[in-house]
Amino acid sequence: MMLSLNNLQNIIYNPVIPFVGTIPDQLDPGTLIVIRGHVPSDADRFQVDLQNGSSMKPRADVAFHFNPRFKRAGCIVCNTLINEKWGREEITYDTPFKREKSFEIVIMVLKDKFQVAVNGKHTLLYGHRIGPEKIDTLGIYGKVNIHSIGFSFSSDLQSTQASSLELTEISRENVPKSGTPQLRLPFAARLNTPMGPGRTVVVKGEVNANAKSFNVDLLAGKSKDIALHLNPRLNIKAFVRNSFLQESWGEEERNITSFPFSPGMYFEMIIYCDVREFKVAVNGVHSLEYKHRFKELSSIDTLEINGDIHLLEVRSW
């Protein structure tokens, strides 16, 4: 299962607001809720509520209250309602929502939290205060126009597959004992089919809460040349790319439209090998290209990963 916004199910188009609807399946880890809409010019606030039931009196519990507000500088307030009492507010001041602008909200359900991206950018994390298995209703209220609501139900996110398709781990001690939900770092694996145009490597993981940096490297095992060194540095929000050829580092590339990683977030990084370059996407959003400096693509046969992440799954095809 790859994180994709294209194969949504149970899509509801142009619902009337306030909208209250039953969620058609259980919110297992890996489920996505995708809401596309537009903020009217006179909006003061709107909210998306993941609820346990739809009762008005007494008011249904709200596991996740996601509430963009537009007064003054604007913010997003998140909270939980239990037994008609609100808990502690979590406020995000760096808000992507603007009046008279369209938006796409992607709420990803993880084991211990919700992860929200807006317009393709990571926005916030919200730890579960009510188990997501209790959520069965979606409510949208306030001044907002909604074009569509869609779901992608998946249950295999964050369930570890050590090395599945087309990978052989080099250091066997990496393989977790049953019940450990992550792969050991440093991680090294041999690609059963070496790199070449059309080949893909996928790395799934979770960034540590206090992460400084991590790296994903594609190497030519024989020469130890690093064809592609991907090095997100969270402490300075730089996504550094380079190659290590003939025992020396080349020139770093850092230009990027927006830094895609954030402490605590779940990510899927897709590395696609094209004829002239590598293309890298994070959580379904294209991030960068890197022109091949190491030309013998068929010699690239090794993947190494290390740094401040929980590594959950690595795949290649």
From Swiss-Prot:
Q: Which GO terms describe its cellular component?
A: cytoplasm; cytoplasmic vesicle; cytosol; extracellular space; membrane
Give the binding site residues for a beta-D-galactoside.
249-255
Single GO biological process annotation from the record: cellular response to virus
Q: What are the GO MF terms of this UniProt record?
A: carbohydrate binding; integrin binding
Give, from the UniProt record, the effect of changing residue 190 to H. Answer: Does not affect localization to cytoplasmic vesicles in case of infection by S.typhimurium
Q: Which compartments is it annotated to reside in?
A: Cytoplasmic vesicle; Cytoplasm, Cytosol
Pinpoint the Galectin domain residues.
19-152, 187-317
Which Pfam families is this protein grouped with?
Answer: Gal-bind_lectin
Q: Where does a carbohydrate bind?
A: 69, 79, 89
Tissues where this protein is expressed: Ubiquitous. Selective expression by prostate carcinomas versus normal prostate and benign prostatic hypertrophy.
Q: Key word Cytoplasm present in the record?
A: yes
Site feature (Critical for binding to sialylated and sulfated oligosaccharides) residues: 59
What InterPro entries does its record include? ConA-like_dom_sf (IPR013320), Galectin-like (IPR044156), Galectin_CRD (IPR001079)
Keywords, in A-Z order: Autophagy, Cytoplasm, Cytoplasmic vesicle, Lectin, Repeat
Q: What is known of its domains?
A: Contains two homologous but distinct carbohydrate-binding domains.
Give the function comment from the record: Beta-galactoside-binding lectin that acts as a sensor of membrane damage caused by infection and restricts the proliferation of infecting pathogens by targeting them for autophagy. Detects membrane rupture by binding beta-galactoside ligands located on the lumenal side of the endosome membrane; these ligands becoming exposed to the cytoplasm following rupture. Restricts infection by initiating autophagy via interaction with CALCOCO2/NDP52. Required to restrict infection of bacterial invasion such as S.typhimurium. Also required to restrict infection of Picornaviridae viruses.
The record's note on quaternary structure and interaction partners says:
Homodimer. Interacts with CALCOCO2/NDP52. Interacts with PDPN; the interaction is glycosylation-dependent; may participate in connection of the lymphatic endothelium to the surrounding extracellular matrix.
Q: What is this protein called?
A: Galectin-8
Q: What species was this sequence derived from?
A: Homo sapiens (Human)
